[in-house]
Design a protein with these regions (language model features):
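Peripheral, non-AAA+ core regions of ATP-driven protein-machinery
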Residues: 1-218, 222-232
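Conserved ASCE/P-loop NTPase catalytic core
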Residues: 205-277
Length: 277
């Protein structure tokens, strides 16, 4: 039986839809085509263990998987979940009625737990652009993806939840986040604030000019003069992000895997203060 499941490939800070076609027929071999990398090819062993650990049976048949578009390299273990769902659906263990409505992404552990992925936000944006009803992703990434409006984002912890949801046995509650409220909630919250600095008026003025105009600044002085202390606080006087800039910043952190667990929209301007040593 031929089925189609939908995932996404991240390129840069954007995503594109990947169609995963799975066909089960008589035989005993497993084939995967469509330019998968080593991590994607290794998904077979993870899927077998995850499926059978949760009481399902991996098909003892010839399984052919095609990931299109075939000219785009598919990288990482985030395709484990859509591959597993496609294989079980092709073996008639999962109903196919909902498969065209949802995009799925997630890495599987051997016990069927669904592990975090990179690029959840650009994947969610692409899912909405392509008209999908919802996105099923790891629970650790759900707040990050839920900043996308007009898309049902479901966070799951185990492959059994996904199977039962697609079979209509349980209902999952989508995570809803007020994007603007989330943006303004952390808008002016800083662990280190420039107002903590007492004195040093001329240096503070130089910092303000540099921050407002986007200029470089170099600090020279003896140890203990306050150089590092002031440099750490410059982020609190940098121009605030717009909502669009916040989305772009969050996409970059998402793709790089730098999002903290449970975080959503990054509303503070990125800042790095490397030590001269």
């Amino acid at each position: 039986m031929l089925v189609k499941v939908f995932g996404a490939a991240v390129q840069g800070i954007d995503a594109l839809v990947v169609t995963i076609e799975v066909n089960c027929s008589q035989g005993i071999r497993f084939f995967m085509v469509g330019l998968p990398d080593a991590a994607v090819k290794e998904s077979h062993e993870r899927i077998v263990s995850a499926v059978e650990h949760n009481g399902y049976r991996f098909p003892r048949k010839q399984v052919i998987v095609n990931m299109s578009p075939a000219d785009i390299r598919k990288e990482g273990a985030a395709y484990d979940l859509p591959l597993a769902v496609g294989i079980l659906a092709s073996d008639e263990k999962i109903e196919t009625g909902k498969l065209s409505e949802y995009m799925l992404m997630g890495e599987l552990s051997l016990d069927g737990s669904i592990l975090p992925i990179k690029g959840a936000l650009p994947i969610a944006i692409k899912a909405r652009e392509e008209g999908f009803k919802g996105l099923i992703i790891p629970k650790a990434n759900v707040r990050e993806a839920a900043v996308v409006n007009h898309l049902d984002v479901y966070g799951v912890e185990n492959i059994t939840e996904v199977i039962r949801f697609l079979n209509g046995e349980i209902e999952l509650e989508p995570t809803v986040i007020d994007t603007r409220a989330e943006f303004f909630r952390e808008y002016t919250h800083f662990d280190l604030d420039f107002s903590d600095v007492k004195g040093q008026e001329s240096v503070k003025r130089a910092f303000e000019v540099a921050a407002a105009g986007g200029h470089n600044i170099i600090l020279i002085g003896p140890p203990g003069a306050g150089k590092s202390m002031m440099a750490k606080r410059i982020a609190s006087i940098m121009p605030p992000l717009t909502l669009q800039e916040a989305l772009e910043t969050t996409k970059i952190h998402s793709v790089a895997g730098k999002m903290e667990r449970g975080s959503s929209l990054l509303s503070q301007r990125p800042f790095r203060a490397p030590h001269p040593t």
